[in-house]
Amino acid sequence: MRKKIRSIHIILFVMLFLVGSFIDISTIHAEAGSRIGSIQIICKGRNSSDKEVTLSGAKFSIFPIQYMKNDELIWEDDFKDSGISLQDTSAEAREKQARQLFAFAKENNISGLTQETDTSGRTSFGELDEGIYLVAQIGNVESGTDKFESAPFLVNIPSEINGNVEYNVTIEPKAEWVSPETPPSNPDKRKDP
């Protein structure tokens, strides 16, 4: 009788061990699968009348700058020789770094994936691995007779937003109104009678 009880205990212990191992493995796979994120862009601006306008047709390109490997950020091959440090994470430093990285991309003919905003001023980039991404508007966008452009910016996947770690990040870049070009006046030029 003792042997039967002992055998039952051993069988139960082995079953609990196997079930516990399965749960741990499932948790690891679920965590690994949740390390993909996205960036949604909502593009709006204020026109010359200070009215908010939705900017459809704005083209944005995304460039992977660094990726996560073994809990360490590694430079993407295209940008590893840029000489730009990303150590300073202040807002001012990030603005400067984004401008420098975009200039480096243009100088070295590095192209990113480009998307255009829809009629609601939205576009998104999905299936993004953990890392740092440069997002830049390509050219400017028109709304009526007004033109708008936004500065390039850096986005971390994941990002800490309001104390929460977010893998799906929504960005509203500051689209600046570009004053229309006025033809230069030439006072020396004679007018035809």
Regions found by a protein language model. Give the residues of each.
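Solvent-exposed loop/turn and edge beta-strand elements of beta-rich ligand-binding domains
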Residues: 1-193
